């Protein structure tokens, strides 16, 4: 199995390095990751400037100023030859639960892999300690995929409790929960008296029902949520069509 491995925490982050070491026990792994932390970069792609890369002695590649999406795009189309069998993103430091997936560079890297035609997995740890647990779970999933491919055309968003492996209760297939909107901004003043602003933490849980990713991880289970690239709200099609007719928009053209 040939794996393109990326993340949004940066090429030297403990999550990606722990996972790369574990995956190399049974797979051919090429790391292509940002040269710095790009958390929250979502699906951003660098279009107005060129990208440089740096290859380390172990073969890992850092994309200078690159986003997670840049890294996967370059990895698939230029840097990994032969091309990968699957794109894996992670292990993220901290969870990507509920509407975190909208902002997540970790999920975006997997999404870019799927957009380019490859199976894709995004892996996050609900904390900052037991990366070995998340690595073991990821290896088990990938071994399963090598035995029997999952033909859903979906991204698997995997969130792992920050626990020793022996304390993991199992795996649940879940849906995304949701958070209350984040609204905290943290102002600071620089030495020259100018105001600086920091984006605050994510909002509290809003929908954390029993079938959500939030609930699974809180209860000690690995959460696996299938995601897809198509953002169309198909169930709203007729509602929007009827609304356009009722307000008369478009009838003059």
UniProtKB/Swiss-Prot annotation:
Annotated compartments: Cytoplasm
Keyword set, alphabetical order: Cytoplasm, Hydrolase, Metal-binding, Nucleotide-binding
Entry note: cofactor: Binds 1 divalent metal cation per subunit.
Entry GO terms, CC: cytoplasm
Molecular-function GO terms, alphabetical: 3'-nucleotidase activity; 5'-nucleotidase activity; exopolyphosphatase activity; metal ion binding; nucleotide binding
EC code: 3.1.3.5, 3.1.3.6, 3.6.1.11
Function description: Nucleotidase with a broad substrate specificity as it can dephosphorylate various ribo- and deoxyribonucleoside 5'-monophosphates and ribonucleoside 3'-monophosphates with highest affinity to 3'-AMP. Also hydrolyzes polyphosphate (exopolyphosphatase activity) with the preference for short-chain-length substrates (P20-25). Might be involved in the regulation of dNTP and NTP pools, and in the turnover of 3'-mononucleotides produced by numerous intracellular RNases (T1, T2, and F) during the degradation of various RNAs.
UniProt family annotation: Belongs to the SurE nucleotidase family.
Stated name of the protein: 5'/3'-nucleotidase SurE
Primary gene name: surE
């Amino acid at each position: 199995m040939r794996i393109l491995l990326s993340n949004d925490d940066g090429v030297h982050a403990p999550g990606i390095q722990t996972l790369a070491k574990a995956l190399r026990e049974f797979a051919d792994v090429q790391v292509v990751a940002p040269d710095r932390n790009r958390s929250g970069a979502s699906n951003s792609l660098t279009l107005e400037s060129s990208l440089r890369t740096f290859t380390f002695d172990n073969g890992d590649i850092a994309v200078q100023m690159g986003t997670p999406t840049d890294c996967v795009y370059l990895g698939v189309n230029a840097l990994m030859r032969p091309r990968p069998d699957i794109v894996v993103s992670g292990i993220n430091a901290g969870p990507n639960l509920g509407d975190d997936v909208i902002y997540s560079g970790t999920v975006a890297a997997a999404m870019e892999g799927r957009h380019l035609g490859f199976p894709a997995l995004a892996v996050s740890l609900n904390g900052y300690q037991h990366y070995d647990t998340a690595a073991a779970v990821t290896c088990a999933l990938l071994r399963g995929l090598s035995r029997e491919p999952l033909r859903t055309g979906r991204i698997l968003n995997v969130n792992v409790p920050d626990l020793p492996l022996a304390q993991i209760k199992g795996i649940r297939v879940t849906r995304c929960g949701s958070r209350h909107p984040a609204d905290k901004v943290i102002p600071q003043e620089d030495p020259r008296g100018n105001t600086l602003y920091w984006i605050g933490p994510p909002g509290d849980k809003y929908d954390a029902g029993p079938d959500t990713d939030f609930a699974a991880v809180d209860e000690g289970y690995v959460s696996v949520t299938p995601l897809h690239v198509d953002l169309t709200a198909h169930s709203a099609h007729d509602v929007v069509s009827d609304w356009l007719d009722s307000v008369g928009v478009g009838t003059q053209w």
